[in-house]
C-alpha cells in the first residue's frame, strides 16, 4: 500500500503530476500474490485521477477491464472495487455515445489555443459535475452541449467564430461573431456558473432573462449569445439566440438548437 499512500500524499499537496508518474509504475508491474492488492488500489486511484482530469480514457478502460476480471476474489478492497466499477460504467457510457452529435470532422478545428482560454474552460465535466452545475443553474443543459464539452474540451476560445444571420446586427450585415464558449463548471471566470455567469449579465448588464448565457462576443459585453428556454421550459431543448445590447437588447434567433448552432460556425475571411 506504500505506493498508494505516497500518491495520496502528493495529491493532497496538489502535486498531481508526481502522483500520476508514481502510480503509472503499477500499470507496468507483473501481478503477483504479494503485490496484487497494492496494484489494484493504485490502479483504481490512478484511473480516478485521470478520469476526473478527462485524460487517457482508452488506457483507463483497458486497465479497469483487466483488474475487474482478475481481482474479483480479492478481499478488503470493496470500496476500490465499487469505485472501479463506477468509473468503468461511466467510460462505457462515454464510448457508447461517440458520434451521437456533430458527425464527421465538424469539431476538428473548433477550438483555438489562446492565453486567456482558461477563463472559459473548467475541469472535466463528469456526469456528477454536470448534474451539480445543472442544479446550480436551474436548467437542463442540451445533450449536444454536454457532448461537446465531454468529447472535445470543456469550454474555450473558438477559431470558427462567425455565425451567419438573415438580418443585420451591430457586428455585421450578415453575421455575428463570438469569442468563446463557456465550459460546464463554476471555476473558470467565464464558465457557465463562474463569476461572469448568466446572473452577472442579467443583473450588471441588463440582459433579458431568457435562459443561459453561453458565449460572449468581441464587443466585450455589448452583445451575447444565450440558450433561449422561453418556449421549451427549463428542461426542454432551447434555441440559440443573439442578444444585442446596442440595439435595445434585440433578440435574434441563430439556430433551433445548440448542435445546429455549432455546425453553423465558420471562419470569416477578411
What are these regions (language model features)?
Residues 21, 59-62, 66:
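Primarily a tetratricopeptide repeat
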Residues 27-28, 65-69:
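Amphipathic alpha-helical segments of tetratricopeptide repeats
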Residues 16, 56-57:
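TPR-repeat structural position
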Residues 86-219, 269:
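A surface-exposed partner-binding patch
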Residues 38, 56, 76, 80-83:
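Structural signature of alpha-solenoid helical repeat junctions
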Amino acid at each position: 500500500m506504500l505506493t498508494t499512500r505516497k500518491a495520496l500524499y502528493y495529491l493532497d499537496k496538489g502535486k498531481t503530476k508526481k502522483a500520476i508518474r508514481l502510480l503509472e509504475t503499477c500499470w507496468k508491474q507483473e501481478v503477483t500474490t504479494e503485490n496484487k492488492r497494492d496494484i489494484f488500489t493504485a490502479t483504481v486511484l490512478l484511473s480516478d485521477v485521470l478520469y476526473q482530469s478527462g485524460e487517457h480514457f482508452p488506457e483507463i478502460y483497458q486497465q479497469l477491464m483487466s483488474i475487474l476480471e482478475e481481482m474479483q476474489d480479492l478481499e478488503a478492497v470493496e470500496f476500490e472495487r465499487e469505485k472501479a466499477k463506477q468509473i468503468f460504467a461511466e467510460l462505457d457510457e462515454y464510448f457508447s455515445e461517440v458520434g451521437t452529435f456533430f458527425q464527421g470532422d465538424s469539431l476538428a478545428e473548433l477550438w483555438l489555443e489562446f492565453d486567456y482560454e482558461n477563463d472559459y474552460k473548467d475541469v472535466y465535466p463528469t456526469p456528477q459535475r454536470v448534474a451539480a452545475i445543472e442544479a446550480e443553474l436551474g436548467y437542463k443543459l442540451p445533450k449536444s452541449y454536454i457532448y461537446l464539452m465531454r468529447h472535445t474540451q470543456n469550454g474555450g476560445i473558438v477559431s470558427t467564430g462567425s455565425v451567419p444571420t438573415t438580418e443585420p446586427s451591430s457586428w455585421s450585415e450578415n453575421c455575428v461573431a463570438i469569442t468563446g464558449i463557456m465550459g460546464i463548471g463554476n471555476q473558470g471566470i467565464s464558465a457557465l456558473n463562474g463569476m461572469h455567469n448568466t446572473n452577472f449579465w442579467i443583473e450588471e448588464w441588463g440582459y433579458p432573462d431568457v435562459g443561459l448565457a453561453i458565449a460572449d462576443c468581441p464587443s466585450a459585453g455589448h452583445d451575447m449569445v444565450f440558450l433561449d428556454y422561453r418556449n421549451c421550459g427549463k428542461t426542454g431543448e432551447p434555441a440559440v439566440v443573439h442578444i444585442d445590447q446596442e440595439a435595445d437588447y434585440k433578440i435574434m434567433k441563430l439556430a433551433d438548437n445548440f448542435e445546429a448552432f455549432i455546425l453553423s460556425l465558420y471562419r470569416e475571411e477578411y
